[in-house]
Regions:
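C-terminal transmembrane-bundle signature of multipass membrane proteins
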Residues: 125-195
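Extracellular-loop-to-transmembrane junctions of the mid-late helices
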Residues: 81-130, 172-175
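Alpha-helical transmembrane segments in eukaryotic/viral proteins
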Residues: 19, 114-121, 161-164
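Membrane-water interface at the C-terminal end of transmembrane alpha helices
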Residues: 55-57, 84-87, 186-195
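Juxtamembrane "helix-exit" motif on the non-cytosolic side of transmembrane helices
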Residues: 19-30, 85-93, 163-171
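Aromatic-anchored segments of alpha-helical transmembrane domains
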Residues: 10-15, 76-86, 155-164
Length: 195
């Protein structure tokens, strides 16, 4: 159930993109204010990270699971506060760069901003705890369990890679390949969790 929740929250990271697309199609223009695009997409980082890192802690450090979840919950609260405070009281363009071209919006975190640093911490942690943790469990297991942990490790590694590239690169042909990587991730997690 935790992996399904994590996957659900991770898929909501594209809610800003989808909402903007629908806004352009229905109303003929982008979401207003533009910072709403970032809020709708990035509000889901914290719950996805907490649940994902709970799974990773269970795989790698079950005896320290509670401590890890508390630490990442605190970091997630800080992330959410920074996201909303920036949106409500300041200029969201200081933490997230928005580039509009025609009917699409691209958003990237501003390098060095605390929100960017927290995203990097979350992604590296998921890679280490979940990606390496799944590889570790796959090595310890046999048969179908080994295969499922192998698929989970591929999912986490590819997800971190394409999520990082998606937020770093500007739109272009390579973005299609990155988004297809997300589609591959959906299939990997499905087959890893399928009974």
């Amino acid at each position: 159930i935790y992996a399904a929740l994590m996957g659900g929250f991770a898929s909501l990271l594209w809610l800003g993109s989808c909402s903007s697309f629908i806004s352009v199609m229905v109303f003929g223009g982008h979401l207003k204010p533009i910072g709403l695009y970032g809020i709708l997409g990035y509000i889901w980082v914290a719950p996805a990270a907490i649940i994902g890192l709970y799974i990773g802690a269970e795989l790698m450090l079950p005896e320290k699971k509670k401590f890890i979840v508390i630490i990442y919950s605190i970091l997630s609260i800080i992330f959410e506060l920074l996201l909303f405070v920036d949106f409500l009281f300041f200029d969201p363009m200081k933490s997230i760069e928005f580039e509009t071209s025609g009917s699409s919006i691209d958003s990237n975190f501003v390098y060095g901003h605390p929100i960017f640093i927290l995203i990097v911490i979350f992604l590296v942690s998921v890679l280490l705890l979940n990606g390496i943790g799944s590889i570790h469990k796959a090595i310890q297991s046999t048969g179908i369990v080994r295969k499922k942990f192998g698929l989970m490790s591929l999912f986490f590694i590819i997800f971190v890679l394409v999520a990082a590239l998606d937020s770093l690169l500007t739109p272009g042909p390579i973005l299609f390949i990155i988004r297809m990587g997300m589609v591959v991730c959906a299939f990997l997690v499905y087959f890893a969790l399928k009974p």
